[in-house]
């Protein structure tokens, strides 16, 4: 007897599917790319069952294609997510997620004494991994923070 499976989230004709986002991170990714203000249809799956993660989040954005730079920002939130570009219901491209070397003007420095809070400068962080933990180092105050501390703000 064949095992019957059914999609829990409807397929899209054209656009981007971001899958294997850790549970509870999907909304942050939605806001990172400003998708919640898009006029395109966005399908969100939260806390979906996953054999690899236990639970996962999923985003499907119609008629929007994420570029390599955006995919590298996504790697800060969900380094093992998959990004598929869909055309006519078929996967035409898979983007590999790689941590960016640096990230500018996306996050605020958690250090309240950092000059970036009082001066008209763009925030800037060097991104690196230490013992499999993602770390960000502020360009201005040179303090090092875990990914979670920076992305929670």
UniProtKB/Swiss-Prot annotation:
GO function terms (MF aspect): metal ion binding
Keywords of this entry: Metal-binding, Pyrimidine biosynthesis, Zinc
Alphabetical GO biological process terms: 'de novo' pyrimidine nucleobase biosynthetic process; pyrimidine nucleotide biosynthetic process
Cofactor details (free text): Binds 1 zinc ion per subunit.
Cofactor(s) the protein needs: Zn(2+)
GO cellular component labels: aspartate carbamoyltransferase complex
Pfam families in the record: PyrI, PyrI_C
Binding site for Zn(2+): 109, 114, 138, 141
Domain of life, per lineage: Bacteria
Signal peptide start-end: none
Function description: Involved in allosteric regulation of aspartate carbamoyltransferase.
Family that this chain belongs to: Belongs to the PyrI family.
Quaternary context: Contains catalytic and regulatory chains.
Name of the protein in its database record: Aspartate carbamoyltransferase regulatory chain
Provenance organism: Vibrio parahaemolyticus serotype O3:K6 (strain RIMD 2210633)
